[in-house]
Amino acid sequence: MHITIVYPGKRPVPPPLYGGGQRVMYWLGKALVQLGHQVTLIAHPASHIPGVELRPIAEAEPADESWHRLIPPTTDVLHLRKTPRTPPPKPFVVTVGGNGRPGQTFHPNTIFLSRHHAGNHGSVHFVHNGLDLAEYECAAARGDYAVFLAKASWDVKNVSGAVQVCRRAGVELHVIGSRNWPLNLHRWLPNIRGVRYHGMLGGQPKADLLARARCLIFPVRWHEPFGNAITEGLASGCYVAATPYGSLPEIVTPDVGVLSAKAVELAEVVKNPARFKPETCRNHVLQGGFTHLDMARKYLAYYEKVLATGRLGEANDPVPQTKPGFDANRLLPWED
């Protein structure tokens, strides 16, 4: 099959530092090539995926006609990351990575990131993100620190909750997150006792920090669509202390972490690592279906469905729509 991935934007595929969506599409392209398929990428000119033809497009938000002209005529199916304004000349699927606005509708060929994410938008179609395990290390000897890996400037990611948990546990917290902190947090956070702020990290520096961490703290207060940080931490041998929101119950099982919306309960988890084994956490990514090859195989099943019928579901299926009253930015409960 010839798959053309369309992902124009300000960041290349893969991104040098931050950019979960771009990194996932990088892993998907690699996996599709490994599985014997032909792949073309329409994306930022600095993009590169081994074995994939790049058709560069400099515009971050091009008109549909701009990228339509770049589609190879031999393409069987297009994989988009944004719903097109005008239908492209080939069968397509769209992966949506965020939460929709109340009442927002989506194209029938939309694929979400988890069962919970799909359900919040009136759909049953989803594929969990997968990563390339070879990019992550899992050290046998672990450091005495926890890691928070998220866009720390975003309230729903709850970095303050991570600080509370680690203070209760008496464990140092390393924060990997946004460099665009509000209120000059990037200046005063490193001065908080027991917290080290690394700003934006990627590649080997991030892998090194995760590979020796005790655990990953992920106390989000929203309906998390997926949470790449969770599988990155698990691949590195980190067990997970997180809230039970969004996709997290689909990813975190009792042998690799604990889910709770109470800081005191997560602090006990962070304080007592003996029940969790790094190799079990890493194997969970492989056995749980969270590798890039698992992801590619699931997407291939959807590609074949669209090629055969033109759509993911049945002709009379309702159009995916954000549930009435669903507010992605409303903070979910958290008990200090």
Regions found by a protein language model. Give the residues of each.
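Short alpha-helical segment that forms part of, or immediately flanks, the ligand-binding pocket
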Residues: A207, I230-A235, P249-E250
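N-terminal strand-loop element at the rim of the active site
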Residues: K10-P15, W27-P62, P182
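Conserved donor-binding/catalytic core segment of Leloir-type glycosyltransferases
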Residues: V124-N129, A134-I176, G288
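Conserved acidic donor-binding segment of nucleotide-sugar-dependent glycosyltransferases
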Residues: T253-V264, V270-R275
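Nucleotide-sugar-dependent
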Residues: P14, S153-K157, R221-G227, P249-E250
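Nucleotide-activated donor-binding/catalytic signature segment of Leloir-type glycosyltransferases, i.e.
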Residues: L185-L201
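A charged, aromatic-enriched C-terminal amphipathic alpha-helix characteristic of glycosyltransferases
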Residues: E61-P62, N272-N329
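Short hydrophobic beta-strand element within catalytic cores of glycosyltransferases
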Residues: C238-A242
